[in-house]
């Protein structure tokens, strides 16, 4: 009993440390930039009734909403990845690797290129695309059950197929691709309060439903036979939680574009620290995902100033080697 209490206390301590780290990273991100600001200016901006000086305008209209978007995107992608890893019984599952992000991406590109006046419906259309891609992967991988190797193969195939659709649109509509190209790279430039307002409901609903399903995901991760023996409706749980993962991924992709490896790397890092209990893994993944995206975006924005490196490139640079490490370790 003492050991269980110590383990629980340790996990709660990790969550608290992550909360503090996210807040600290956002404060540092507000300070750093081409125009540095002080802590006193940040405090004044947060409580001022009017934004009268340049520093306040930079903090409130540019850096703060961008930080919030980065945190929400990171949380959504990380939790989506954690869910997919349980649902698909594969530690290498990730919204991008298994084609979910590609489905959302294709749907988004269709709107950006063919219906540019309807960009306000991108989140909804991206969700439909993400859900369709997830179901396609699941259907292709099903043969008397789902095996991890088939999930990866089906995901790669679906991602390649949907990626070819994106490429075809970019080729046939070359005169309209500027906005779509910037979106596909995965970046947070020019993100402000309107994007926060669009993303927040998706993130809130998705994260709440994810946490409500945490116990079921923990049971599901034990294996189908064990889960059925414990009374879990396995396929129903898979379908519902796949919907939740698609909602989170679609919300993130619709705002930030195609950012890979967050859903792969973050849950694994947390799993090494706090174990496989999804009651702690999901909130921990959300916080660590937020932390990593805020830090990565800050590095991309500040390190090579005045050139801004999209956060999608930063994540791919560090995430790809980690993915290869996981492949070698699992083999």
What is each of the regions a protein language model found here?
Residues 1-331:
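Alpha-helical transmembrane segments in inner-membrane proteins
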């Amino acid at each position: 009993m003492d050991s269980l209490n110590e383990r629980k206390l340790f996990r709660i301590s990790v969550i608290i440390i992550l909360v503090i780290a996210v807040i600290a990273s956002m404060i540092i991100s507000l300070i750093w930039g081409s125009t540095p600001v002080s802590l006193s200016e940040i405090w004044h901006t947060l409580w001022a009734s009017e934004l009268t000086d340049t520093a306040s305008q930079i903090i409130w209209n540019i850096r703060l909403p961008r930080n919030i978007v980065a945190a929400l995107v990171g949380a959504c992608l990380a939790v989506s990845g954690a869910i997919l890893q349980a649902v698909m019984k594969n530690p290498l599952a990730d919204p991008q690797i298994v084609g979910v992000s590609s489905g959302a991406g294709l749907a988004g590109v269709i709107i950006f290129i063919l219906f540019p006046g309807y960009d306000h419906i991108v989140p909804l259309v991206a969700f439909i695309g993400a859900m369709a891609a997830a179901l396609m992967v699941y259907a292709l991988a099903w043969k008397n059950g789902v095996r991890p190797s088939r999930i990866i193969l089906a995901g790669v195939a679906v991602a390649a197929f949907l990626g070819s659709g994106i490429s075809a649109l970019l080729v046939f509509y070359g005169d309209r691709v500027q906005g779509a190209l910037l979106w596909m790279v995965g970046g947070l430039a020019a993100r402000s309060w309107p994007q926060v307002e669009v993303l927040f409901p998706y993130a809130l609903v998705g994260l709440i439903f994810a946490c409500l399903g945490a116990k079921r995901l923990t049971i599901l991760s034990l294996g189908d036979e064990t889960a059925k023996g414990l009374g879990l409706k396995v396929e129903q749980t898979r379908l519902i939680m796949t919907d939740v993962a698609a909602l989170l991924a679609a919300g993130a992709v619709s705002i930030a574009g195609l950012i890979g490896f967050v859903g792969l790397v973050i849950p694994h890092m947390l799993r090494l620290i706090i174990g496989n209990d999804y009651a702690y893994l999901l909130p921990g993944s959300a916080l660590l995902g937020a932390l990593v995206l805020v830090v990565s975006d800050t590095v991309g924005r500040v390190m090579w100033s005045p050139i801004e490196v999209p956060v999608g490139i930063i994540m791919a640079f560090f995430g790809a080697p980690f993915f290869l490490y996981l492949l070698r370790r699992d083999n």
